[in-house]
Design a protein with these regions (language model features):
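Short, well-ordered beta-strand elements
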Residues: 131-150
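Glycine-centered structural positions embedded in regular secondary structure
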Residues: 35, 108, 143, 157-158, ...
Length: 173
């Protein structure tokens, strides 16, 4: 494209998708509504997370976002539109090892089958003082995003929320 990475992401992804609250985590900038990040000691005490410069990994997780923007992004992975069907298949299809065993992971998306047979795709992220999970359930046109500002997994919370929505949607069918 000839553009630097951050300009490309802004011009070709964030602006076209309306991701108004997704920005690179510039540590030297004031970012409106940037949250504080926390950790937990072994005794359960909540403490401020240490400073981390995420700019070295912008392409692999150095952005700040909101659940709303994450859901908008996830909606583009439910079906063809912003991305071609072939691209979605490439991203979501689990890779296969040389021995034929599935990795359960595509390009950025883990793939799983729930007890009810619904296929899910998920992408998690974590840094010192925060964690995220973006969960897609294409059979129900459902996207759930969770963001927590403390080190540790967000998965349990997001999976519970998704299950509530799925149960409700299935009851309507």
């Amino acid at each position: 494209s000839g553009e630097d990475f951050l300009s490309f992401m802004r011009d070709e992804v964030f602006e076209p998708l309306g991701l108004r609250h997704t920005v690179a985590d510039h540590t030297d900038s004031i970012i409106t509504f940037r949250t504080s990040f926390y950790g937990k000691r072994e005794d359960g005490t909540i403490v401020n997370a240490p400073y981390v410069d995420n700019s070295y990994k912008w392409a692999g997780g150095g952005f700040l976002s909101t659940p709303e923007d994450m859901v908008r992004f996830g909606q583009q992975h439910l079906g063809e539109g912003f991305l071609r069907a072939e691209t979605l298949a490439e991203l979501q299809t689990p890779q296969t090892l040389a021995n034929g065993e599935s990795t359960g992971y595509g390009i950025g998306w883990s793939s799983d089958e729930q007890d009810d047979g619904d296929r899910t795709y998920a992408h998690s992220g974590g840094s010192v003082g925060g964690a995220t999970l973006l969960l897609l359930v294409p059979e129900h046109d459902l996207v759930v995003a969770g963001v927590v500002n403390i080190s540790g997994p967000a998965a349990r919370i997001v999976q519970r929320v998704a299950q509530v929505f799925e149960d409700h949607l299935e009851a309507l069918e």
